[in-house]
Amino acid sequence: MKASEIFKQYIWLTDTIYRSGGISLQELNERWVRTEMSGGVPMTRMTFNRHKMAIEEIFGLCIECQRKGGYYYYIENEEVLKNNNLQHWLLDSLSIS
């Protein structure tokens, strides 16, 4: 898989979690399967975890899991998006395309 395709997956994942305000892995996968990127194949937990680590490394965004009341993933440090104009612009412009 090309690096640009993986990067698009990071953007999609970040954007989906951010816009939802909290999302279960099941719901995330339901949305994922409906994208062209997925090819109709669900995202494995291993892939999700690798993407989650890469997103933190590249964008500085921490995707955490709220275990109480269900397992919901959310961006713990949303202020990074609000305070870092370059990262915000990049995520914004790439999530539109």
Name the predicted role of every residue range.
Residues 1-96:
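Short, basic/aromatic recognition patches that contact phosphate-bearing ligands
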